């Protein structure tokens, strides 16, 4: 530990093909990222959110509405669910992702730089604390518990039925 006196040797290599000489912005090809078969929940974190119309609205066999009402309500349910989800994700996904990123970065930093050094320090000090605690237990708590146990061992109860 101390001051580093060696110079770091850093080099940057760039191909002429990958470096653009004009000052305009280059955007990624959106068709490359628009894979509709992509599984966006590979660990099935939100498998409980797969709700259909029948999971929310159900009519028993004895009471049915008109078929047209059922079909229209089903279509309206699916359309409104789709549109509202898209609308909410447009306005909430980026800010919430930003907030979650800040939160996870903060928690990671606290865990790495505060919590784990504290735990490691406690584990280093623990053997000496364990020795002191064992001495206190042997000197104070063990004789007290033994005395109380002997006092209560002489108590006897007898039940009689009158």
Swiss-Prot record:
Ranges facing Cytoplasmic side: 1-86, 108-162
UniProt keywords, alphabetically: Cell membrane, Cytoplasm, Golgi apparatus, Membrane, Nucleus, Phosphoprotein
Subcellular location, record wording: Nucleus; Cytoplasm; Golgi apparatus membrane; Cell membrane
Phosphoserine modification, residue list: 20, 23, 36
One GO term (biological process): caveola assembly
PTM comment text: Phosphorylated on serine and tyrosine residues. CAV1 promotes phosphorylation on Ser-23 which then targets the complex to the plasma membrane, lipid rafts and caveolae. Phosphorylation on Ser-36 appears to modulate mitosis in endothelial cells. Phosphorylation on both Tyr-19 and Tyr-27 is required for insulin-induced 'Ser-727' phosphorylation of STAT3 and its activation. Phosphorylation on Tyr-19 is required for insulin-induced phosphorylation of MAPK1 and DNA binding of STAT3. Tyrosine phosphorylation is induced by both EGF and insulin.
Function of the protein: May act as a scaffolding protein within caveolar membranes. Interacts directly with G-protein alpha subunits and can functionally regulate their activity. Acts as an accessory protein in conjunction with CAV1 in targeting to lipid rafts and driving caveolae formation. The Ser-36 phosphorylated form has a role in modulating mitosis in endothelial cells. Positive regulator of cellular mitogenesis of the MAPK signaling pathway. Required for the insulin-stimulated nuclear translocation and activation of MAPK1 and STAT3, and the subsequent regulation of cell cycle progression.
Binding partners and assembly: Monomer or homodimer. Interacts with CAV1; the interaction forms a stable heterooligomeric complex that is required for targeting to lipid rafts and for caveolae formation. Tyrosine phosphorylated forms do not form heterooligomers with the Tyr-19-phosphorylated form existing as a monomer or dimer, and the Tyr-27-form as a monomer only. Interacts (tyrosine phosphorylated form) with the SH2 domain-containing proteins, RASA1, NCK1 and SRC. Interacts (tyrosine phosphorylated form) with INSR, the interaction (Tyr-27-phosphorylated form) is increased on insulin stimulation.
Name of the protein described by the UniProt record: Caveolin-2
Organism: Homo sapiens
Lineage: Eukaryota, Metazoa, Chordata, Craniata, Vertebrata
